[in-house]
């Protein structure tokens, strides 16, 4: 048994039974398939499942709203199936930084297949800066307050933790690549942190006892990776402000608005090819914060994960592709079956590939099981 992997962790009173969590993942599955998949992953021994992209606004084009009866019931079923199978549930609250009205102009091209998903991503990224820079301050206050409202509903739906999504709009406000404002929400690193801090503070004020994690989206230069999120060199400015606002832990990842193959890197990636490919960002966070840090990105090998935990390089580990490849990874590392782990090979063929082709997130191992049957 791996002792450190299976050591409990407490975050603001929430006890996680081990150090492994399921990272927020867009699945693209039907509702029933999605719930079944969550149940399988929870039963596999993960301490907590983070449910990605739960919208804080009343209306959302891409995800169910907590404010609607149908949406609230869906999230209640999500937490129910997770709890039933022995894990905790975390809601990743977010607000999109996409200019939805501007996006409508691209719909005909998408329908006619003249615009590919990758090209659409580029077009939307081009509009992010002007959109973020142009949001009126009066609207910003309503958006940040909605994080508190959504957090209350998430708590009522049964979630045990809130994660504030530090990418999307929080990340774009944080980044000088997109944020060209000259008011109190821009023009300096401290000002660019203000939006995220107000979102966190709204959650903390609404739910004083709820553990709050921040998805810390980090970007870098030389070489350039990530566009939204916090520049590595600006972490000393951002982290104290985020913690003053009420953060309890960090979930550290590469910032968005670059290629999906950067944020979800395959093993062939020219820069992020190794095991634990984003750990160097965790190292930077640890320099300036004593809060628990969760790593994500290419974590598959239990020996490697155990070593990072033992060295206190990280405090817990998030996995997506590995737990899709083998949901029993946590259970196997808790017993004597680690030699039977199906390791993710980071090919991205059926997971990221399935999502991009609107087939849903699956795994090459699924095909092998079908062939055996």
Swiss-Prot record:
A single BP term in Gene Ontology: porphyrin-containing compound catabolic process
Pathway annotation: Porphyrin-containing compound metabolism; protoheme degradation
Residues binding [4Fe-4S] cluster, per UniProt: 344, 347, 351, 363
Cystine connections: none
Binding site for FMN: 92, 215
Gene Ontology molecular function: 4 iron, 4 sulfur cluster binding; FMN binding; metal ion binding; oxidoreductase activity, acting on the CH-CH group of donors
Named cofactor requirement(s): FMN; [4Fe-4S] cluster
Superkingdom as given in the UniProt entry: Bacteria
Site (Important for catalytic activity, assists active site Arg in protonation of C4) residue list: 257
InterPro entries according to UniProt: Aldolase_TIM, BilR_N, NADH:flavin_oxidoreductase, OxRdtase_FMN_N
Record key words, sorted: 4Fe-4S, Flavoprotein, FMN, Iron, Iron-sulfur, Metal-binding, NAD, Oxidoreductase
Catalytic activity: urobilinogen + 4 A = (4Z,15Z)-bilirubin IXalpha + 4 AH2; urobilinogen + 2 A = (4Z,15Z)-mesobilirubin IXalpha + 2 AH2
Pfam families recorded: Oxidored_FMN (PF00724)
Active site (record annotation): 168 (proton donor)
EC numbers: 1.3.-.-
Record's miscellaneous remark: Bilirubin reductase is a key enzyme in the human gut microbiome. The enzyme is essential to human health, as excess serum bilirubin can cause jaundice and even neurological damage. BilR is nearly universally present in the gut microbiome of healthy adults, while the prevalence of the gene is much lower in patients with inflammatory bowel disease (IBD) and in infants, especially during the first few months of life when infants are most susceptible to developing jaundice.
Purpose: Bilirubin reductase that catalyzes reduction of mesobilirubin and/or bilirubin to urobilinogen, a key step during heme degradation. Cooperates with BilS, which is probably involved in electron transfer for BilR. Urobilinogen then spontaneously degrades into urobilin, which gives urine its distinctive yellow color.
Family: Belongs to the NADH:flavin oxidoreductase/NADH oxidase family.
UniProt-recorded name of the protein: Bilirubin reductase
């Amino acid at each position: 048994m791996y002792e450190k992997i299976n050591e409990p962790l407490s975050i603001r009173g929430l006890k996680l039974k081990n150090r492994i969590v399921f990272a927020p993942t867009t699945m693209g599955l039907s509702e029933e398939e999605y719930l079944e998949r969550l149940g399988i992953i929870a039963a596999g021994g993960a301490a907590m499942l983070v449910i990605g992209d739960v919208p804080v606004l009343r209306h959302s084009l891409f995800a169910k709203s907590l404010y609607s009866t149908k949406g609230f019931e869906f999230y209640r079923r999500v937490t129910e199936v997770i709890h039933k199978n022995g894990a905790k549930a975390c809601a990743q609250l977010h607000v999109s930084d996409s200019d939805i009205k501007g996006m409508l102009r691209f719909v005909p091209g998408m329908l006619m297949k003249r615009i590919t998903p990758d090209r659409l991503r580029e077009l939307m990224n081009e509009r992010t800066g002007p959109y973020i820079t142009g949001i009126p301050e009066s609207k910003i206050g309503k958006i940040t307050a909605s994080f508190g409202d959504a957090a209350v509903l998430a708590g009522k739906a049964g979630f045990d933790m809130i994660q504030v999504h530090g990418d999307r709009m929080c990340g774009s406000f944080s980044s000088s690549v997109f944020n060209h404002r000259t008011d109190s929400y821009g023009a300096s690193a401290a000002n660019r942190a203000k939006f995220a801090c107000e979102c966190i503070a709204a959650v903390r004020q609404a739910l004083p006892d709820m553990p709050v994690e921040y998805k810390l989206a980090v970007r870098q230069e030389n070489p350039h990776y990530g566009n939204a999120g916090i520049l590595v060199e600006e972490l000393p400015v951002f982290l104290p402000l985020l913690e003053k606002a009420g953060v309890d832990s960090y979930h550290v990842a590469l910032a968005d608005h670059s290629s999906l193959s950067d944020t979800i890197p395959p093993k062939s990636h020219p820069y992020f090819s190794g095991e634990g490919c984003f750990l160097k960002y965790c190292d930077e966070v640890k320099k300036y914060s004593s809060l628990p840090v969760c790593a994500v990105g290419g974590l598959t090998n239990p020996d490697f994960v155990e070593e990072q935990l033992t060295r206190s390089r990280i405090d817990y580990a998030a996995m997506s592709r590995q737990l899709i490849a083998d949901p029993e990874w946590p259970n196997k590392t808790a017993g004597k079956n680690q030699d039977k782990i199906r390791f993710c090979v980071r090919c991205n063929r059926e997971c990221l590939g399935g999502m991009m082709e609107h087939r849903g997130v699956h795994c090459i191992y699924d095909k092998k099981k079908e062939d055996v049957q």
